[in-house]
Amino acid sequence: MFDKEYVFYGKHADMVRKMTAKLSDEIGRGFFGTNYEIYQVAPFVGWIYKRRAAVDKNGETTKIFPDKMMKGKQDLVFNYRNIMALHFGDKSTEEIMHIAFGLDYKDQDRKEYDEIYDSYVLGGVEEMYEQIFEKNGANSVDEYIRNLYEFIEELNMRLYGTWDDLS
């Protein structure tokens, strides 16, 4: 589990590359520094927005190398367990515990659940990309940054409600 490279394919690879690409000469990096950073955040964005997507094997690829996956394994397993618990929240506690905690070393038994997790990763990639680069017809760095700000504000509202609710 999370001990080999992860590959983004096709349109998702293109989206990940754009989110990690240098925004401009003045801004020497992208919204995300690495593919791994996107992989950490994407499943939760997918869950929050109820967005899942299938693998698109057409086109180019971009990867997260095995050493990076293994270094972050503890965090990735934590993410996986949370997404499984959220996705299967209508099941019994025993079933959730089995799915989220009982299949770590049973790759074949876990395969269908890995595919569910991956669908949230890819759905989250799509949602982040669309929110940042496509919303409001954005076509400049300033507009992308504004969209990112609005996206973060919207995430906050989806998670916590209004600012008044926080006090």
What annotation goes with each model-predicted range?
Residues 31-57:
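Short, basic amphipathic alpha-helical segments that act as recognition/interaction helices
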Residues 1-26, 52-167:
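Charged, low-complexity intrinsically disordered terminal regions and linker tails
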